[in-house]
């Protein structure tokens, strides 16, 4: 992975195309700069997945374009395809997740859809 410029980075529940900025093998982490969104983060309480009866049902936004973040080295994979446009990829990832949730009829999916619609408005999509 040392010579990779672009990587697929998993951060919390989102997946991103990112530029590899720095690797710290001794700390098992890498600094990446977000270029595109492949999977929008899952909404809700990560410690109680698919549950709505939790103290706080989190809204989780995608990392912003060019945002830098540390990710575990184990979460990186090489990315050899053309890097998509950030806004286009964000819209596609969000629409895919909304579509998947609309096909479900649960309290959790409805709560997620509500949070995703808020994200959609805040993103200006």
Regions found by a protein language model. Give the residues of each.
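Short coil-to-beta transition motif at edge beta-strands of beta-rich domains
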Residues: 1-11
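Histidine- and/or cysteine-centered catalytic micro-motif in compact active-site loops
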Residues: 12, 35-37
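Short beta-strand-centered aromatic/proline hotspots
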Residues: 15-25
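Short, solvent-exposed secondary-structure boundary/capping segments
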Residues: 27-35
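Intrinsically disordered, low-complexity, charged/polar segments
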Residues: 38-107, 125
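Glycine-rich, aromatic-bearing surface loops/beta-hairpins
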Residues: 111-125
